[in-house]
Amino acid sequence: MYTGMARWDHLTWQEIGERLTRGAIAVLPVGSVEQHGPHLPVATDVLIPVGLADRVAGALGADDLGARLVMLPPFYYTYAKHSNWWPGTLNLD
């Protein structure tokens, strides 16, 4: 039964070391934090790749490849100058 991909930032340094010796495969979700209108959270562009990565790991299951996947903390930043007018945007400038 699949219980979710391991999250790098939820592991201890010892657990990370063990996974690295077993050939861990890092998954880096990338998205931006910016406005999407009043009906969606500002992290929508991050939540989608995080969910997709978790679904891919679920599809692979507990076989060797699926068990080696570890999700890194998402990269939340982008150049989003067009969204600077709205509160909540995290912009690299």
List the model feature ranges, each with a label.
Residues 2-93:
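N-terminal catalytic or cofactor-binding beta/alpha core of small enzyme domains
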